[in-house]
Amino acid sequence: MKIRIGHGFDVHKFGAARPLILCGVEVPYETGLVAHSDGDVVLHAISDAILGALALGDIGKHFPDTDAAYKGADSRVLLRHCYALARAKGFVLGNLDVTIIAQVPKMAPHIEAMRQILAADLTSELDDINVKATTTEHLGFTGRKEGIAVEAVVLMTRKHD
């Protein structure tokens, strides 16, 4: 069996007059995230982790913010595309670990719904998907409630014939 590890990181600032979407879940908050797509910073980090594990670049290469086709794009569609690229190379998700770094809003009420969506989109078992949240204790831009950062780590596996 061949394994690959990928790490993804993304940041978006608050300020868009749109819903806050994280892992495909609408999280109640006063503002959304500024982005070319729907601003789902979590799915962007996961997509980058998958692409990175397979040496396929990053989401900016695959979905450039200079391309009008991706304006307001549903990040779940982008994630599923990245995962399809991995599957085409014979890889499947072993497990996923995500850390959402945000002072606001509270993530705990939404974590299970996020995990369910990720398991469905990545055709994985729920116990292979972990989503957790933390704050920076009011330090830095996330602590000042200016935006959200996310780190994602994936283990991708391929079984040899």
From Swiss-Prot:
Database matches in CDD domains: MECDP_synthase
Reaction(s) this enzyme catalyzes, per UniProt: 4-CDP-2-C-methyl-D-erythritol 2-phosphate = 2-C-methyl-D-erythritol 2,4-cyclic diphosphate + CMP
Cofactor binding notes: Binds 1 divalent metal cation per subunit.
Named cofactor requirement(s): a divalent metal cation
Encoding gene, per UniProt annotation: ispF
Presence of the UniProt keyword Lyase in the record: yes
Name under which the protein is recorded: 2-C-methyl-D-erythritol 2,4-cyclodiphosphate synthase
Residues that bind 4-CDP-2-C-methyl-D-erythritol 2-phosphate: 10-12, 36-37, 58-60, 63-67, 102-108, 134-137, 141, 144
Signal peptide range in chain numbering: none
Assigned keywords, A-Z: Isoprene biosynthesis, Lyase, Metal-binding
Annotated positions for site Transition state stabilizer: H36, T135
Gene Ontology terms: biological process: isopentenyl diphosphate biosynthetic process, methylerythritol 4-phosphate pathway; terpenoid biosynthetic process
Record SUPFAM superfamilies: IpsF-like
Pathway this chain belongs to: Isoprenoid biosynthesis; isopentenyl diphosphate biosynthesis via DXP pathway; isopentenyl diphosphate from 1-deoxy-D-xylulose 5-phosphate: step 4/6
GO molecular function annotation: 2-C-methyl-D-erythritol 2,4-cyclodiphosphate synthase activity; metal ion binding
